[in-house]
Protein backbone atom coordinates (compact mmCIF):
# COMPACT_ATOMS: atom_id res chain seq x y z
CA UNK A 1 0.00 0.00 0.00
CA UNK A 2 1.39 3.38 -1.03
CA UNK A 3 2.22 5.75 1.81
CA UNK A 4 0.75 9.23 1.58
CA UNK A 5 2.60 12.21 3.01
CA UNK A 6 0.41 15.10 4.09
CA UNK A 7 1.76 18.65 3.88
CA UNK A 8 0.90 20.53 7.11
CA UNK A 9 3.00 23.64 6.41
CA UNK A 10 6.28 24.78 4.95
CA UNK A 11 8.31 22.20 6.90
CA UNK A 12 5.66 20.18 8.77
CA UNK A 13 4.59 16.81 7.42
CA UNK A 14 2.42 13.88 8.49
CA UNK A 15 2.12 10.30 7.33
CA UNK A 16 0.33 7.17 8.55
CA UNK A 17 2.11 3.83 8.69
CA UNK A 18 0.32 0.47 8.93
CA UNK A 19 1.51 -3.10 9.41
CA UNK A 20 0.06 -6.43 10.49
CA UNK A 21 0.33 -7.29 14.17
CA UNK A 22 1.08 -10.85 13.10
CA UNK A 23 4.38 -9.64 11.63
CA UNK A 24 5.63 -9.20 15.19
CA UNK A 25 4.52 -12.57 16.53
CA UNK A 26 7.94 -14.26 16.53
CA UNK A 27 9.68 -11.19 17.92
CA UNK A 28 7.03 -10.92 20.62
CA UNK A 29 7.47 -14.53 21.66
CA UNK A 30 11.26 -14.17 21.81
CA UNK A 31 11.06 -10.91 23.79
CA UNK A 32 8.68 -12.40 26.39
CA UNK A 33 10.89 -15.48 26.70
CA UNK A 34 13.89 -13.25 27.37
CA UNK A 35 11.96 -11.29 30.00
CA UNK A 36 10.83 -14.54 31.61
CA UNK A 37 14.41 -15.69 32.13
CA UNK A 38 15.15 -12.81 34.50
CA UNK A 39 11.68 -12.28 35.97
CA UNK A 40 11.51 -12.89 39.73
CA UNK A 41 8.29 -14.21 41.26
CA UNK A 42 7.96 -15.65 44.75
CA UNK A 43 7.64 -19.45 44.63
CA UNK A 44 9.35 -19.84 41.25
CA UNK A 45 12.96 -20.37 40.35
CA UNK A 46 14.53 -17.85 37.90
CA UNK A 47 13.55 -18.78 34.35
CA UNK A 48 10.71 -21.06 35.50
CA UNK A 49 7.95 -18.44 35.75
CA UNK A 50 4.89 -19.62 33.74
CA UNK A 51 4.39 -17.93 30.36
CA UNK A 52 0.91 -16.84 31.42
CA UNK A 53 2.35 -14.81 34.30
CA UNK A 54 5.00 -13.25 32.08
CA UNK A 55 2.29 -12.41 29.54
CA UNK A 56 0.04 -10.89 32.16
CA UNK A 57 2.72 -8.64 33.64
CA UNK A 58 4.73 -7.67 30.55
CA UNK A 59 2.56 -8.44 27.52
CA UNK A 60 1.25 -4.90 26.96
CA UNK A 61 4.67 -3.31 27.51
CA UNK A 62 6.32 -5.66 25.01
CA UNK A 63 3.53 -5.02 22.49
CA UNK A 64 3.97 -1.27 22.71
CA UNK A 65 7.79 -1.41 22.47
CA UNK A 66 7.77 -3.75 19.45
CA UNK A 67 5.04 -1.82 17.65
CA UNK A 68 6.76 1.51 18.27
CA UNK A 69 10.13 0.16 17.07
CA UNK A 70 8.51 -1.36 13.97
CA UNK A 71 6.78 1.92 13.08
CA UNK A 72 10.02 3.82 13.65
CA UNK A 73 11.96 1.43 11.39
CA UNK A 74 9.32 1.71 8.67
CA UNK A 75 9.46 5.50 8.85
CA UNK A 76 13.25 5.71 8.45
CA UNK A 77 13.07 3.20 5.58
CA UNK A 78 10.48 5.47 3.96
CA UNK A 79 12.75 8.52 4.37
CA UNK A 80 15.65 6.69 2.77
CA UNK A 81 13.56 5.29 -0.09
CA UNK A 82 11.80 8.58 -0.90
CA UNK A 83 14.79 10.83 -0.19
CA UNK A 84 12.93 12.77 2.50
CA UNK A 85 15.26 15.45 3.99
CA UNK A 86 14.26 14.77 7.59
CA UNK A 87 14.89 17.51 10.17
CA UNK A 88 15.10 16.37 13.78
CA UNK A 89 13.27 13.50 15.44
CA UNK A 90 9.77 12.41 14.33
CA UNK A 91 6.84 12.15 16.74
CA UNK A 92 5.01 8.81 16.57
CA UNK A 93 1.45 8.54 17.87
CA UNK A 94 -0.39 5.17 18.07
CA UNK A 95 -3.61 5.19 16.06
CA UNK A 96 -4.82 1.67 16.82
CA UNK A 97 -5.33 -0.57 19.85
CA UNK A 98 -2.43 -2.77 20.93
CA UNK A 99 -4.45 -5.91 20.12
CA UNK A 100 -5.67 -4.76 16.70
CA UNK A 101 -4.87 -6.97 13.72
CA UNK A 102 -3.62 -3.97 11.77
CA UNK A 103 -1.41 -1.60 13.74
CA UNK A 104 -1.35 2.04 12.67
CA UNK A 105 0.79 5.00 13.70
CA UNK A 106 0.53 8.65 12.77
CA UNK A 107 3.99 10.12 12.27
CA UNK A 108 4.50 13.87 12.55
CA UNK A 109 7.83 15.18 11.33
CA UNK A 110 9.64 18.16 9.85
CA UNK A 111 11.75 18.38 6.72
CA UNK A 112 14.72 20.61 5.97
CA UNK A 113 13.46 23.93 4.61
CA UNK A 114 14.09 25.51 1.26
CA UNK A 115 16.75 28.19 1.67
CA UNK A 116 16.27 31.22 -0.55
CA UNK A 117 19.60 32.94 -1.02
CA UNK A 118 19.60 36.72 -1.27
CA UNK A 119 21.74 38.94 -3.47
CA UNK A 120 25.19 38.87 -1.87
CA UNK A 121 26.42 41.62 -4.18
CA UNK A 122 24.02 44.03 -2.44
CA UNK A 123 25.77 43.49 0.90
CA UNK A 124 28.58 45.57 2.33
CA UNK A 125 31.10 44.35 4.91
CA UNK A 126 34.06 45.99 6.60
CA UNK A 127 37.52 44.45 6.55
CA UNK A 128 39.80 46.03 9.10
CA UNK A 129 43.53 46.47 8.63
CA UNK A 130 46.00 47.12 11.44
CA UNK A 131 49.74 47.69 11.31
CA UNK A 132 51.94 46.76 14.24
CA UNK A 133 54.66 49.35 14.78
CA UNK A 134 57.28 50.10 17.41
CA UNK A 135 54.74 51.84 19.69
CA UNK A 136 52.52 48.73 19.81
CA UNK A 137 55.54 46.54 20.54
CA UNK A 138 56.60 48.91 23.36
CA UNK A 139 53.12 48.79 24.92
CA UNK A 140 53.06 45.00 24.75
CA UNK A 141 56.47 44.82 26.42
CA UNK A 142 55.22 47.18 29.16
CA UNK A 143 52.40 44.72 29.84
CA UNK A 144 54.99 41.93 30.15
CA UNK A 145 57.05 44.10 32.51
CA UNK A 146 54.00 44.75 34.70
CA UNK A 147 53.50 41.01 35.00
CA UNK A 148 56.91 40.88 36.71
CA UNK A 149 56.38 43.92 38.93
CA UNK A 150 57.58 43.82 42.52
CA UNK A 151 57.19 46.42 45.27
CA UNK A 152 59.54 48.25 47.63
CA UNK A 153 58.70 50.39 50.65
CA UNK A 154 58.76 54.09 49.86
CA UNK A 155 61.65 55.92 51.52
CA UNK A 156 63.69 52.79 52.24
CA UNK A 157 66.93 52.50 50.29
CA UNK A 158 67.42 49.32 48.31
CA UNK A 159 69.04 47.85 45.23
CA UNK A 160 66.51 49.67 43.05
CA UNK A 161 66.46 52.97 44.95
CA UNK A 162 64.01 54.37 47.48
CA UNK A 163 61.14 55.42 45.20
CA UNK A 164 61.85 59.14 45.55
CA UNK A 165 61.60 61.81 48.23
CA UNK A 166 57.81 61.79 48.33
CA UNK A 167 56.75 58.98 50.67
CA UNK A 168 53.01 59.62 50.34
CA UNK A 169 50.84 57.08 48.52
CA UNK A 170 50.62 57.73 44.77
CA UNK A 171 48.77 56.16 41.86
CA UNK A 172 50.44 52.87 41.01
CA UNK A 173 51.58 52.31 44.60
CA UNK A 174 50.63 49.25 46.58
CA UNK A 175 49.15 50.25 49.93
CA UNK A 176 48.45 48.09 52.97
CA UNK A 177 45.75 49.44 55.28
CA UNK A 178 43.54 48.63 58.23
CA UNK A 179 39.97 49.84 57.86
CA UNK A 180 36.74 49.81 59.79
CA UNK A 181 33.29 50.89 58.62
CA UNK A 182 30.26 51.81 60.72
CA UNK A 183 26.57 52.30 60.00
CA UNK A 184 24.96 54.68 62.52
CA UNK A 185 28.04 54.23 64.72
CA UNK A 186 27.87 50.43 64.71
CA UNK A 187 30.34 48.15 62.95
CA UNK A 188 28.80 45.83 60.36
CA UNK A 189 29.73 42.43 58.94
CA UNK A 190 32.41 42.65 56.27
CA UNK A 191 33.17 46.28 57.10
CA UNK A 192 36.46 45.68 58.90
CA UNK A 193 39.85 44.31 57.83
CA UNK A 194 43.51 44.40 58.80
CA UNK A 195 46.52 44.41 56.48
CA UNK A 196 44.30 44.84 53.45
CA UNK A 197 46.36 45.26 50.28
CA UNK A 198 45.49 46.93 46.98
CA UNK A 199 47.10 49.00 44.22
CA UNK A 200 46.00 52.61 43.79
CA UNK A 201 44.60 53.40 40.37
CA UNK A 202 43.65 49.84 39.42
CA UNK A 203 39.98 50.47 40.14
CA UNK A 204 39.66 47.38 42.31
CA UNK A 205 38.31 49.40 45.25
CA UNK A 206 35.37 51.79 45.42
CA UNK A 207 36.45 55.32 44.33
CA UNK A 208 36.02 56.76 47.84
CA UNK A 209 38.53 54.24 49.23
CA UNK A 210 41.13 55.07 46.61
CA UNK A 211 40.65 58.83 47.06
CA UNK A 212 41.05 58.53 50.84
CA UNK A 213 44.28 56.51 50.64
CA UNK A 214 45.84 58.72 47.96
CA UNK A 215 48.40 61.09 49.53
CA UNK A 216 48.55 59.40 52.94
CA UNK A 217 51.82 58.32 54.54
CA UNK A 218 52.56 55.33 56.77
CA UNK A 219 50.81 55.71 60.14
CA UNK A 220 48.34 58.34 58.93
CA UNK A 221 44.57 57.84 59.17
CA UNK A 222 41.58 59.32 57.44
CA UNK A 223 37.80 59.10 57.88
CA UNK A 224 35.31 59.51 55.08
CA UNK A 225 31.68 58.73 54.20
CA UNK A 226 31.01 56.02 51.62
CA UNK A 227 27.66 55.39 49.99
CA UNK A 228 27.40 51.84 48.67
CA UNK A 229 25.86 51.45 45.20
CA UNK A 230 22.22 50.32 45.16
CA UNK A 231 23.26 47.16 43.30
CA UNK A 232 26.17 46.39 45.64
CA UNK A 233 26.64 42.65 46.21
CA UNK A 234 26.32 43.06 49.99
CA UNK A 235 22.55 43.50 50.32
CA UNK A 236 22.73 44.58 53.98
CA UNK A 237 24.65 47.74 53.05
CA UNK A 238 23.52 48.33 49.45
CA UNK A 239 22.34 51.93 49.00
CA UNK A 240 23.40 52.92 52.54
CA UNK A 241 26.06 55.42 53.67
CA UNK A 242 28.75 54.19 56.07
CA UNK A 243 31.54 56.07 57.86
CA UNK A 244 34.94 54.49 57.20
CA UNK A 245 38.30 55.08 58.85
CA UNK A 246 41.49 53.83 57.22
CA UNK A 247 45.01 53.65 58.65
CA UNK A 248 47.96 53.20 56.31
CA UNK A 249 50.36 50.42 57.36
CA UNK A 250 52.73 50.57 54.38
CA UNK A 251 53.22 52.35 51.07
CA UNK A 252 55.16 50.48 48.39
CA UNK A 253 56.27 51.75 45.02
CA UNK A 254 56.27 49.55 41.94
CA UNK A 255 59.53 48.47 40.37
CA UNK A 256 59.36 46.92 36.92
CA UNK A 257 62.29 45.06 35.34
CA UNK A 258 64.55 46.89 32.90
CA UNK A 259 64.18 45.85 29.27
CA UNK A 260 67.48 44.07 28.74
CA UNK A 261 68.78 40.66 27.71
CA UNK A 262 68.09 39.28 31.20
CA UNK A 263 64.46 40.34 30.89
CA UNK A 264 64.26 38.72 27.45
CA UNK A 265 65.71 35.52 28.92
CA UNK A 266 63.06 35.56 31.67
CA UNK A 267 60.45 35.45 28.88
CA UNK A 268 62.03 32.36 27.33
CA UNK A 269 64.13 34.10 24.68
CA UNK A 270 67.33 32.10 25.05
CA UNK A 271 69.27 33.74 22.22
CA UNK A 272 69.16 37.09 20.46
CA UNK A 273 68.37 39.22 23.51
CA UNK A 274 66.11 42.26 23.28
CA UNK A 275 66.07 42.35 19.47
CA UNK A 276 64.85 38.76 19.26
CA UNK A 277 62.31 39.42 22.01
CA UNK A 278 60.88 42.38 20.10
CA UNK A 279 60.71 40.25 16.97
CA UNK A 280 58.75 37.55 18.79
CA UNK A 281 56.44 40.11 20.40
CA UNK A 282 55.67 41.52 16.95
CA UNK A 283 54.95 38.03 15.60
CA UNK A 284 52.54 37.41 18.46
CA UNK A 285 50.82 40.75 17.91
CA UNK A 286 50.55 40.07 14.17
CA UNK A 287 48.91 36.71 14.92
CA UNK A 288 46.50 38.39 17.33
CA UNK A 289 45.65 41.04 14.73
CA UNK A 290 44.97 38.39 12.11
CA UNK A 291 42.81 36.39 14.54
CA UNK A 292 40.73 39.40 15.60
CA UNK A 293 40.28 40.74 12.07
CA UNK A 294 39.22 37.30 10.82
CA UNK A 295 36.82 36.91 13.75
CA UNK A 296 35.22 40.33 13.14
CA UNK A 297 34.84 39.70 9.42
CA UNK A 298 33.40 36.25 10.04
CA UNK A 299 30.86 37.64 12.52
CA UNK A 300 29.74 40.35 10.08
CA UNK A 301 29.51 37.91 7.14
CA UNK A 302 27.42 35.50 9.21
CA UNK A 303 25.08 38.31 10.26
CA UNK A 304 24.70 39.41 6.63
CA UNK A 305 24.00 35.83 5.51
CA UNK A 306 21.37 35.54 8.22
CA UNK A 307 19.71 38.76 7.05
CA UNK A 308 19.90 38.02 3.32
CA UNK A 309 18.54 34.46 3.33
CA UNK A 310 14.94 33.37 3.81
CA UNK A 311 13.87 30.07 5.35
CA UNK A 312 11.49 28.54 7.90
CA UNK A 313 13.38 27.03 10.82
CA UNK A 314 12.20 23.55 11.94
CA UNK A 315 11.13 23.65 15.58
CA UNK A 316 12.56 20.19 16.26
CA UNK A 317 16.07 21.36 15.37
CA UNK A 318 15.72 24.42 17.62
CA UNK A 319 14.56 22.21 20.51
CA UNK A 320 17.56 19.92 20.07
CA UNK A 321 19.92 22.89 19.96
CA UNK A 322 18.36 24.33 23.12
CA UNK A 323 18.97 21.02 24.89
CA UNK A 324 22.60 21.06 23.76
CA UNK A 325 23.03 24.60 25.08
CA UNK A 326 21.49 23.62 28.43
CA UNK A 327 23.92 20.69 28.71
CA UNK A 328 26.80 22.97 27.76
CA UNK A 329 25.76 25.46 30.46
CA UNK A 330 25.63 22.67 33.07
CA UNK A 331 29.05 21.45 31.97
CA UNK A 332 30.40 24.97 32.40
CA UNK A 333 28.96 25.15 35.93
CA UNK A 334 30.51 21.76 36.76
CA UNK A 335 33.93 22.97 35.60
CA UNK A 336 33.55 25.98 37.89
CA UNK A 337 32.89 23.66 40.81
CA UNK A 338 29.24 24.66 41.34
CA UNK A 339 27.51 22.06 43.57
CA UNK A 340 24.84 19.87 41.89
CA UNK A 341 25.57 21.55 38.56
CA UNK A 342 24.79 18.34 36.67
CA UNK A 343 21.11 18.69 37.58
CA UNK A 344 20.90 22.48 37.69
CA UNK A 345 17.38 23.66 36.74
CA UNK A 346 18.29 25.65 33.62
CA UNK A 347 15.18 26.48 31.53
CA UNK A 348 15.69 25.77 27.84
CA UNK A 349 13.56 28.83 26.99
CA UNK A 350 16.41 31.21 27.83
CA UNK A 351 18.33 29.78 24.88
CA UNK A 352 15.46 30.04 22.37
CA UNK A 353 16.83 33.03 20.47
CA UNK A 354 20.42 31.79 20.45
CA UNK A 355 19.37 28.28 19.39
CA UNK A 356 17.16 29.60 16.58
CA UNK A 357 19.99 31.75 15.23
CA UNK A 358 22.44 28.86 15.35
CA UNK A 359 20.11 26.46 13.58
CA UNK A 360 19.17 29.05 10.99
CA UNK A 361 22.79 29.85 10.22
CA UNK A 362 23.70 26.17 10.11
CA UNK A 363 21.02 25.51 7.49
CA UNK A 364 22.14 28.51 5.43
CA UNK A 365 25.79 27.43 5.53
CA UNK A 366 24.87 23.85 4.67
CA UNK A 367 22.94 24.96 1.60
CA UNK A 368 25.63 27.43 0.53
CA UNK A 369 28.41 24.86 0.90
CA UNK A 370 26.43 22.32 -1.13
CA UNK A 371 25.48 24.73 -3.92
CA UNK A 372 28.88 26.39 -4.26
CA UNK A 373 31.03 23.34 -3.46
CA UNK A 374 32.72 25.04 -0.51
CA UNK A 375 33.46 21.93 1.56
CA UNK A 376 36.92 21.78 3.13
CA UNK A 377 39.43 19.76 1.11
CA UNK A 378 42.09 17.45 2.55
CA UNK A 379 44.82 19.84 1.40
CA UNK A 380 43.12 22.82 3.06
CA UNK A 381 42.76 20.94 6.33
CA UNK A 382 46.41 19.90 6.22
CA UNK A 383 47.55 23.46 5.48
CA UNK A 384 45.50 24.88 8.38
CA UNK A 385 46.88 22.32 10.84
CA UNK A 386 50.45 22.99 9.72
CA UNK A 387 49.94 26.76 10.04
CA UNK A 388 48.64 26.40 13.60
CA UNK A 389 51.36 23.90 14.50
CA UNK A 390 54.10 26.26 13.29
CA UNK A 391 53.50 28.53 16.30
CA UNK A 392 54.51 25.75 18.75
CA UNK A 393 57.90 24.49 19.86
CA UNK A 394 57.35 21.02 18.37
CA UNK A 395 55.16 21.41 15.24
CA UNK A 396 55.30 17.72 14.33
CA UNK A 397 53.89 16.73 17.71
CA UNK A 398 51.03 19.23 17.31
CA UNK A 399 50.24 17.83 13.84
CA UNK A 400 50.12 14.30 15.31
CA UNK A 401 47.88 15.59 18.11
CA UNK A 402 45.32 16.90 15.61
CA UNK A 403 45.34 13.81 13.41
CA UNK A 404 45.03 11.45 16.39
CA UNK A 405 41.54 12.67 17.25
CA UNK A 406 38.58 12.81 14.78
CA UNK A 407 36.89 15.48 16.89
CA UNK A 408 39.89 17.81 16.59
CA UNK A 409 40.07 17.18 12.86
CA UNK A 410 36.37 18.04 12.59
CA UNK A 411 37.00 21.35 14.36
CA UNK A 412 39.69 22.22 11.80
CA UNK A 413 37.41 21.13 8.95
CA UNK A 414 34.68 23.46 10.22
CA UNK A 415 37.20 26.29 10.55
CA UNK A 416 38.31 25.84 6.93
CA UNK A 417 34.72 25.55 5.74
CA UNK A 418 33.81 28.85 7.42
CA UNK A 419 36.86 30.44 5.81
CA UNK A 420 35.69 29.17 2.40
CA UNK A 421 32.26 30.69 3.01
CA UNK A 422 33.79 34.04 4.00
CA UNK A 423 35.98 34.09 0.87
CA UNK A 424 32.99 33.24 -1.34
CA UNK A 425 30.79 35.90 0.26
CA UNK A 426 33.43 38.64 0.15
CA UNK A 427 34.19 37.82 -3.50
CA UNK A 428 30.61 38.91 -4.29
CA UNK A 429 29.85 41.57 -1.66
CA UNK A 430 31.27 45.08 -1.44
CA UNK A 431 34.24 45.00 0.92
CA UNK A 432 35.24 48.28 2.57
CA UNK A 433 38.82 48.35 3.90
CA UNK A 434 39.22 50.35 7.10
CA UNK A 435 42.55 51.02 8.79
CA UNK A 436 42.43 51.19 12.59
CA UNK A 437 44.97 51.12 15.40
CA UNK A 438 45.71 48.03 17.47
CA UNK A 439 44.09 49.71 20.47
CA UNK A 440 40.90 50.37 18.48
CA UNK A 441 40.92 46.81 17.18
CA UNK A 442 41.22 45.46 20.72
CA UNK A 443 38.04 47.29 21.77
CA UNK A 444 35.89 45.89 18.95
CA UNK A 445 33.72 42.88 19.73
Swiss-Prot record:
- Subcellular localization(s) per the UniProt record: Cytoplasm
Which NCBIfam families did the record assign?
tig
Q: Which GO terms describe its molecular function?
A: peptidyl-prolyl cis-trans isomerase activity; protein folding chaperone; ribosome binding
Q: Which InterPro entries match?
A: PPIase_dom_sf, PPIase_FKBP_dom, Trig_fac, Trigger_fac_C, Trigger_fac_C_sf, Trigger_fac_ribosome-bd_bac, Trigger_fac_ribosome-bd_sf, Trigger_fact/SurA_dom_sf
Protein name as annotated: Trigger factor
Q: What does this protein do?
A: Involved in protein export. Acts as a chaperone by maintaining the newly synthesized protein in an open conformation. Functions as a peptidyl-prolyl cis-trans isomerase.
Name the HAMAP family on file: Trigger_factor_Tig
- E.C. designation(s): 5.2.1.8
